[in-house]
A protein has these predicted regions:
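Phosphate-binding loop of NTP-binding sites
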Residues: 10, 90-176
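N-terminal leader/targeting and accessory segments in enzymes
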Residues: 1-92
Length: 176
């Protein structure tokens, strides 16, 4: 991410800053507490088996500079942003960031062949443009926002893969 601050994240999510500096820059989003470093926003997702909020202390210990959380407990100097739903907030942040960029993005979806189609389109476009594309097969509700985290102002065109596991998810991803 480029030129994103805690204040931008507050605007994107309509969240509440519980503590920390709103002018702090954010360089990356991560849902993995083991990958947190300075200027990284840890996004704890509540899954079917695990509520990743339990990893907040580990994320802070590993240098986590800022957190997005659904719970109201906040301590220390790291910014905590309270939002109703962390997955939705991550998608809102990705949409906010994507809207700051002016490049066209091609979306690829379907039942079979998304990755191959995306790779073929990107390969052809790379002959003329600096292409931004889905990393691996990160095409989910979590993966697309994490992919957009790597978008830069140097990219000229994007090719993103979008997958779904529930009704309505392609609309959500397309809106990002």
């Amino acid at each position: 991410m480029e030129n994103i601050t805690i204040q931008d994240i507050l605007e994107a999510t309509d969240g509440t800053l519980l503590c920390g500096d709103p002018s702090m820059k954010i360089d990356h989003l991560s849902t993995n507490s083991m990958e947190i470093g300075p200027n990284t926003l840890f996004v704890p997702i509540i899954g079917e088996r695990v509520d990743a909020h339990i990893f907040i202390p580990n994320a802070l210990k590993e240098g986590g500079a800022c957190l997005t959380q659904e719970h109201t407990e906040a301590s220390g100097n790291a910014p905590y942003i309270k939002v109703p739903d962390t997955l939705t907030a991550m998608q809102q942040i990705a949409a906010y960031y994507r809207n700051k960029m002016s490049l066209p993005i091609i979306g690829v979806t379907g039942s079979v062949g998304k990755t191959t189609t995306r790779e073929m389109i990107a390969h052809v476009l790379k002959g003329k443009y600096k292409v931004f594309e889905t990393i691996g097969n990160q095409n989910s509700q979590v993966g697309v926002p994490l992919t957009l985290d790597h978008l830069t102002s140097e990219d000229e065109i994007g090719v993103l893969e979008m997958g779904m596991s529930e009704k309505g998810q392609i609309t959500t991803l397309g809106n990002i």
